[in-house]
Amino acid sequence: MAVQRTFSIIKPDATERNLTGAINAVIEKAGLRIVGQRRIQMTRAQAERFYSVHSARPFFGELVDFMISGPVVVQVLEAEDAITKYREVMGATNPADAADGTIRKLFAKSIGENSVHGSDSAENAALEIAQFFSEADLTN
């Protein structure tokens, strides 16, 4: 399998509790390299664009409000089979269902405040990365 990139967001529920370093440690221990990272305050327009796939869902407004409620850390991760690897490291969306040792089991507050986002496909990873990073922002 070739080296692949995926996109990650450390969400406001985690940044407000100063968990970025602890989450990064789990990411790196799993063999994922952080090749791009920045802490930002997402705007409403950015959050609405990022989560536009959910715009017709009843939770869309709450999701956008949550994502702009505090700083987030956007990241590009790299490894062989990075998308699958990171999704395994994140754990199930609902932390109650997440496996022991996963980011969501360790740090998430609830299904809504579940600490991290990760791309679900190579196509979405490319689109999500491009929303926040240029190739010049990333290291090898």
Swiss-Prot record:
Coiled coil: none annotated. One of its GO terms (molecular function) is nucleoside diphosphate kinase activity. One of its GO terms (biological process) is CTP biosynthetic process. GO terms for cellular component: cytoplasm. It catalyses: a 2'-deoxyribonucleoside 5'-diphosphate + ATP = a 2'-deoxyribonucleoside 5'-triphosphate + ADP; a ribonucleoside 5'-diphosphate + ATP = a ribonucleoside 5'-triphosphate + ADP. Pfam families: NDK (PF00334). The active site is at residue 117. SUPFAM superfamilies: Nucleoside diphosphate kinase, NDK (SSF54919). Its EC number is 2.7.4.6. Keywords: ATP-binding, Cytoplasm, Kinase, Magnesium, Metal-binding, Nucleotide metabolism, Nucleotide-binding, Phosphoprotein, Transferase. Its cofactor is Mg(2+). Homotetramer. Belongs to the NDK family. This is Nucleoside diphosphate kinase. The gene is ndk.
